[in-house]
Amino acid sequence: YQGPEAKESGHPSDAFPSALSVAEQERVTGKEVLLGSVIAWEIYARLADRVPFRDYGFDQSIAIAIASTCSACKVMGLSQDETANAIALTTASNITLGEVRFGEVSMWKGCAAANGVRNGVFSASLAKQGMTGPLNIFDGPRGFFHGISGEFELGKFGGKEEPFRIMQASMKHFAVGSVAQTALECILELRSEI
């Protein structure tokens, strides 16, 4: 994801397994899976539009965890209160540091987002069973806004007045970082001249 005014990029589709795994458990239809996937993308993209996680020393898998939680909650049919608690549980327990993607990269780089998905589904399951989370996790004096991002509003979500962010999806031509796409195209063109 690289929205037109995004402060962070990343892969919102990393959150799709939350809808798939919960759908199997809950025995829901493909419609619910698609809805959960769109919700995951929308939440991730809205966070990426507002929070430059990398600049603050954190990893984008925080957004994957929160997006996965929202997706799982929707597919599981959780109430608004249960969903709020699930999001609080995930956010309180899944603050991933940015070092997982920089320097000498370990195997954990490939697991950070998957761990966020797992934690999102687990938090939704806990909330469904009545577990509560710190509901002031975003705006409390020691919360997300204070410690990570500064205050922000997510803005209007996709629907009647605003297009869904998933409609801005793009595909990479090559399995390399987005900033290397044009360089690789040039290399392939030059290769035939050598």
PLM features: residue spans?
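Glycine- and aromatic-rich loop/turn segments at beta-sheet edges
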Residues: Q2, R46-Y56, T96-E104
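Active-site nucleophile and cofactor-binding loops and adjacent substrate-binding regions
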Residues: A6-S13, V33-S37, F53-A65, K109-N115, ...
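Hydrophobic alpha-helical hairpins/lids featuring a short glycine-rich hinge
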Residues: Y1-R46
